[in-house]
Regions:
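Short amphipathic alpha-helices in soluble, non-transmembrane regions
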Residues: 22-27, 62-69
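Surface-exposed, low-hydrophobicity interaction/linker segments
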Residues: 5-34
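A preference for well-ordered globular domain cores
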Residues: 10-13, 40, 55, 92-95
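Long, intrinsically disordered low-complexity tracts in eukaryotic nuclear proteins
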Residues: 2-9, 100-103
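Conserved short beta-strand edge segments in small beta-sheet-based binding/regulatory domains
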Residues: 70-86
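Short, intrinsically disordered low-complexity segments
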Residues: 34-67
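Short, conserved secondary-structure transition motifs
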Residues: 50-52, 83-88
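Short, low-order "capping/linker" segments at domain edges
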Residues: 86-103
Length: 103
């Protein structure tokens, strides 16, 4: 897969870890294999992230959006993707976000 899609949310409490795990499990069932592969998560430094390897970052993001549209945390999402062998992110959401990083 050529890209890494990162779905990122701010962390407000340790209870968010359970939410992250549940969201990751949901996402594994929501993204068809031809759209991407959920490859784990990261929690700490004030943020939580889910990583998806994909050749279709926009479509994989839409799959996530469909899966999480009723999830209260969805409104806080930041999403971006980068080449699997690169460091420069292209922001998907929110549109006004200029810089994206994984701490």
């Amino acid at each position: 897969m050529h890209y890494v899609l990162v779905l990122q949310w701010p962390v407000s409490s340790e209870a968010d870890f359970d939410t992250l795990i549940a969201m990751e499990d949901t996402l594994e069932g929501a993204i068809p294999g031809e759209h991407g592969i959920v490859d784990g998560h990261d929690f700490g430094s004030g943020e939580m992230n889910i990583f998806v390897y994909t050749d279709l970052p926009l479509i994989a993001f839409r799959d996530a959006e469909a899966a999480f549209s009723d999830e209260p945390k969805w409104s806080e999402i930041r999403a971006a993707y980068r080449p699997a062998e690169g460091d420069t992110y292209s922001v998907l959401w929110p549109h006004h976000l200029k810089d994206f990083a994984v701490q």
